[in-house]
Design a protein with these regions (language model features):
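Active-site hotspot residues in diverse enzymes, especially metal/ion-binding acidic/histidine motifs
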Residues: 1-153
Length: 153
């Protein structure tokens, strides 16, 4: 919870521990377009690729890592060759998992009630990117946890 401007955030190292504890291997690789990727083998093993040379801040690393772990933890993978698989559905599931860890709903509500309402300030408070903060807010609006309009950019 937000007390005296401090909150207990999920540390980046904890995200690496979550991956390790679930048997997900993290590999550094060249990913100039996406910066990160996740995949599951037919045997159920998960792998996450991260390009450390494309990620500039710890907030970006946390967001990419949490999103990719979200794919692995929820089994939300799509088949690029299937006409019947909906990519956005799997991306939303991964983002929901990541938002729950990086921007917990009750802590976000508390921050908003305390007057932290600018997107940049919320992103800074939760140590995430502004883009991910907006996605988290959108997720909580879709779930009915926050009421639109949730925030003014």
């Amino acid at each position: 919870m937000l007390k005296r401007g401090r909150r207990r955030k999920t540390r980046t190292s904890e995200l690496y521990e979550i991956a390790a504890n679930s048997g997900t291997e993290i590999i550094c690789c060249d990913l100039p377009r996406t910066h990160s990727v996740s995949a599951m083998t037919s045997s159920g093993s998960c792998y996450i690729g991260i390009d450390p040379f494309e990620i500039e801040t710890e907030a970006e690393e946390r967001v990419h890592l949490a999103h990719e772990i979200g794919h692995c933890e929820t089994g939300s993978f799509y088949n690029a060759y299937s006409d019947f698989d909906i990519r956005e559905k799997h991306e939303l599931r991964a983002d929901c998992w990541a938002a729950a860890r990086l921007v917990p709903a009750q802590e976000l509500i508390c921050a908003l009630k305390c007057g932290v309402v600018e997107l940049w300030a919320l992103a800074e408070l939760f140590d995430v990117t502004e883009d991910f903060m907006q996605r988290s807010i959108n997720i909580y609006c879709l779930k009915g946890i926050l009421q639109p309009p949730c925030i003014v950019n």
